[in-house]
Amino acid sequence: MALPRLEIDGEWFRGTDGRRYILRGVNLGGDCKVPFTPNGHTNIATDFSGHRTVSFVGRPFPLAEAGEHFSRLRAWGFNCLRLLTTWEAVEHAGPYQYDESYLDYFAALCRLADDYGLYVFIDFHQDVWSRMTGGDGAPGWLFDAVGLDFTKFHAAGAAHVMQYKYEFARGGRQEDNYPTMTWSQNYKYPANAIMWTLFFAGNTFCPDFMVQGRSAQDFLQEHYL
């Protein structure tokens, strides 16, 4: 089915069919922030060294399973999805190297959602810069570009990263190792702070810091998706 395009009409969403719409949405989903191949779940130890060869195809689920999930969501009364993706999912291999397979997968997922009567709000998600700094979003090659070794962030106390702290063999919730929702502490840790400072204020605080012939700020902003 082709859903009517929604427009803003005062306090309402109004479709091109003239009807008013109330959107009832669900988040889909948290695991879109990490790779599907290899499994990027945050309870699995990694130093992220293979960040250029990951794949997000299959997040939040394989296309073959999408119909089952979408039909359930419709049956439960939902008509809107907040569908997550990240900069890393699209451009993890390097500058201007876009993962065409992932983009094809993501587009197909959106078309299927439309077939099941689900509107899609695409959330280009980012938390505390990237997976390497305890969150998600930016690809790892940006650290290479500015000369930061993300494999040393945890040891240096520059980031609070679950992949280094969680004991996979022990399993379960581990409040002693990684208390729930403490990823947000990375807003005050150096690795995240350095990257955002370079991104928004590099020309002010370090105007002579050059990356491939450009100021660090200009380099980061020109590459941002």
Regions found by a protein language model. Name each.
Residues 20-23, 28-225:
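Active-site mouth of glycoside hydrolases
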Residues 1-22:
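N-terminal module-boundary/linker segments of secreted carbohydrate-active enzymes
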